[in-house]
């Protein structure tokens, strides 16, 4: 029998400043993958992480 998937899901975090910023260090969009608990965190994640394209700490939001 197959097990159910559980409450932990894999989500993708994308930099919010990479889309609008034109004076970046390099081209592209910074993306990270992480896991979140579906029961404890029902809303979308917003985490400050390092963006190598902007060369600074920026807010990364969960995308679908």
Curated annotation (Swiss-Prot):
The keyword Mitochondrion does not apply. Belongs to the bacterial ribosomal protein bL33 family. Pfam families: Ribosomal_L33. GO terms for molecular function: structural constituent of ribosome. The keyword Zinc does not apply. It comes from Synechococcus sp. (strain RCC307). GO terms for biological process: translation. The gene is rpmG. Keywords: Ribonucleoprotein, Ribosomal protein. The lineage of its organism: Bacteria, Bacillati, Cyanobacteriota, Cyanophyceae, Synechococcales. Gene3D superfamilies: Ribosomal protein L33. One of its GO terms (cellular component) is cytoplasm. This is Large ribosomal subunit protein bL33. It comes from the Bacteria. Signal peptide: none annotated.
């Amino acid at each position: 029998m197959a097990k159910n998937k559980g409450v932990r899901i894999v989500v993708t975090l994308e930099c919010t400043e990479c889309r609008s910023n034109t004076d970046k260090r390099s081209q592209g969009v910074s993306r990270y993958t992480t896991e979140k608990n579906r029961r404890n965190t029902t809303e979308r994640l917003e985490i400050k992480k390092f963006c190598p394209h902007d060369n600074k700490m920026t807010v990364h939001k969960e995308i679908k």
